[in-house]
Structures are given as C-alpha cells and as structure tokens.
Amino acid sequence: MSETTEATGAASNARAKGASAPRFWRSDALPFIEARSIDDGRKVCYAKHSHETFSIGAVTNGRSVYLNRHAREWIGSGAVVMMNPDDVHACNPVAGERWSYRMLHVDVAWFTKLQHELGFNENHAFRAFSQIMSLDAGLFDGLNRLCAILANDDDTGTLRKESAAITFFSNVQQTLNPTTLPERDASGQLARAAEFIAENCTRALKLDDVCAAAGLSASHLIRAFKQRYGMTPHAYLINRRIQYSRAQLRRGAPIADVALDAGFADQAHLQRTFKRLVAATPGQYRC
C-alpha cells in the first residue's frame, strides 16, 4: 500500500470518527440553553432516560425509533420531537442506517418565564406539552437555524444568539399551544419521593429512606413510581446522578472527582453509565 493510499485511508477514518462523535455547544453567557448534534449516529444507543430540562430535537437524516413515556413511533428526517422535563424517553436509529439529529436542552425556569410573558400561564408554573412529535416545517427549519446561530464562533456577541433563542421558543409555544397534563399523584407522595431522590442523589440511598420520605410502602412506591415517572426509583436515582454529573462537567470538574462526588463507584462506573444514558463519554461532553 502506498503512502498516499495510507494517508487517504487515515483521513477517511478520522472523518468517520468525527462524524460519529457527538458535538456539544454551551456558553457561560447563555447558561439557559445547550445544543447537541451528531452527523452519523448509526452506532448510537440510548437507554431510556430523562432530562431536567425541556428538550426539543430535529432528525436531519435517517430514521429512528422514538419512545416517549408510553408512546412508540418511527420517525424520519423532518421530524421534530419534544420531551417535557422528567419524561422518560429514548430515540435510537434504525439498524445500519446513517442517522443525524440536532437537539436543544433549555432551562425550565427560563422557558416558564417566556411562557408567562407570552400569556400561556398565570401562576408561573411550567405548562407541559401534550404533543411529543411534530412534522411542522417551520419548527424544523427554526430549530436548525437556531443551532447554526448558536454554533457560529465568528459571532461572539450574545444579543443575536439570545434573541434567536427567544424567537424560536416563542414559535414553539405559539405552534404547539400546550395543554396542562392531567393531574397525577394528587396527594403529592410520589412527587415527594422524586424530590427526595433528586435532593439526595449523590448519597447511597436505601429504599426505606425513600419510602419514609414519601410515606408509602415499598411495594406501592415501586409500582406507582414507575407508572408516574416511567422508571423505577433506582433508575430515577441513576438518571439524577447523571444530571448532576453533567452539571459538574460543564463547570470543568475532573472526571474522576465527578464520578465519586456523584455517587458512582469509580470513574469506569460513571463512564459506562454516562455512555449508556447520554450516548457520549464524559470526556466528549466536557469539551
């Protein structure tokens, strides 16, 4: 094999690896929003997970299987997906097909304030979206346009980027016009259980601790919690640890320290779990 052929092959492999690696964008000046994209996600594999943010993404190439709570749909290029905070979901490519997407995660408090300013809520509480997927071309184009503006390193000012974010999410609100989800867990016991887990996610929690906080028996808690949140209390705990880890990594904390602080056995344990739920390594996310 000639040196030219070897060099060409190496460059091709580098491009392939680059296309399959997730890219993240975030800015200290705009802490309420984070963007993620991948050009070739055919090897991506997401386990069921949730976010503490409102998340919206666009499939730009290929097809995937989209799970959101109890719904399962096959979606393709042009689809826009929406995930309310804490809604369990997953989106994975059809086997062997090149798959690309862009995703935005936005702070709930920021979006709630925008909803209030637009007249969609009166009590300053986030209004969840009942719709989980849309084929609206305006939303699709707007999301891609916002991602391009955010990722433009030549534009160092925040005014254009923040204005573009407000414009897009105002359009999301006007287009989807969310309705309040049916009231669940009127007694608040499950909410107390979830809150207790979230506040103590870095500790070595026992099931008895969660039961005591919620005032529920273990059998009822496990059954009702999974029905309400789409995952067991343990899975919810792991998700919260990953959310905590993401926040620490964004601040530049060393991965080994994050692993121990978040309650994982070691860095390898964090690495495996992070990859399974985020479809990226802690190092890729931290960059």
Placement of each model-derived feature along the sequence:
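Basic/polar phosphate-binding segments, predominantly the helix-turn-helix DNA-binding elements
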Residues: A198, R203-I242, R250, A259-C287
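Conserved ASCE/P-loop NTPase catalytic core
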Residues: A256
